[in-house]
Design a protein with these regions (language model features):
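Rossmann-fold NAD(P) dinucleotide-binding segment
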Residues: 37-39, 44, 48, 52-71, ...
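A generic structural signal for well-ordered alpha-helical segments
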Residues: 21, 61, 84-87, 116
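Short glycine/serine/threonine-rich phosphate/pyrophosphate-binding segments
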Residues: 13-17, 53-56, 105
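Conserved strand-to-helix beginnings and helix N-cap segments that scaffold or border functional pockets
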Residues: 58, 80, 105-106, 135-139, ...
Length: 215
């Protein structure tokens, strides 16, 4: 890869990416220096922030269209519309979870919606006690794959990176799907796959579902 990267955010996800992309990162921005973003340009912008930097990123991309990967969650409807607007000018890849495993689970649910509707559906999401959003962005992503909204329960405890359990109940049977993260490297690897994907695109809005269809 012969490209330069602007990395927004300096939290756990960003730190897992930095060793893997150290030869390509031009600068790492956080809430203390995000105002400096306009002074830099790169081939790719990766947003790993907590969404507090959105306005700076939006203004930057309007002036400097850049292939963009959005890993942050919790965007408002207005912000999502702004992201879609930007995707008319440049490729934007967005996901609440960059794990291929979660993408496979979502595909299974979408492909079998009619049958799954016959079950009572539940999602349980487990994360570390400092996790801010509840339910998690991943739970919301999984919820969007159902045609009928499942019941969601969020548990925040200990130092769990991330675990999601989907239960489908009928009178005489139960289906359980569990996805557990044991290392944040799984997200970093997914982001690197999305970099390879987005480098081939000129504009448009893309998700892990699009990436999965091209693997």
């Amino acid at each position: 890869m012969n490209n330069t990267i602007l990395l927004i955010g300096n939290g756990k996800l960003s730190k897992s990416l930095q060793p893997l992309l150290k030869n390509y990162i031009v600068f790492v921005f956080d809430e203390n220096n995000i105002t400096e973003l306009k002074k830099y340009q790169g081939s790719i912008l990766i947003d790993c922030s907590l969404n507090r930097a959105f306005n700076y990123i939006y203004d930057y991309l309007k002036n400097f269209p850049t292939k963009t990967i959005i890993c942050s969650t919790g965007h408002s409807k207005k912000q999502m519309n702004q992201i879609k607007e930007l995707s008319n000018l440049m490729p934007i890849f967005k996901s609440e979870n960059f794990s291929l495993g979660i993408s496979l689970i979502n595909k299974f649910i979408k492909d079998n919606k009619k049958i799954i509707n016959r079950y009572d559906n539940y999602i349980f999401d487990f994360h570390h006690k400092n996790k801010i959003d509840s339910p998690s962005g991943t739970s919301k992503l999984i919820m969007s794959s159902f045609s009928r909204s499942p019941n969601v329960f969020s548990i925040r405890t200990s130092n769990i990176i991330g675990s999601h359990k989907i239960n489908l109940f009928q009178d005489d049977e139960e289906i359980e799907i569990t996805h557990k993260i044991t290392s944040r490297n799984v997200f970093a690897k997914g982001i690197i796959l999305s970099i390879d994907f987005i480098l081939k695109k000129e504009k448009g809005f893309f998700t892990m579902e699009d990436l999965l269809n091209e693997i």
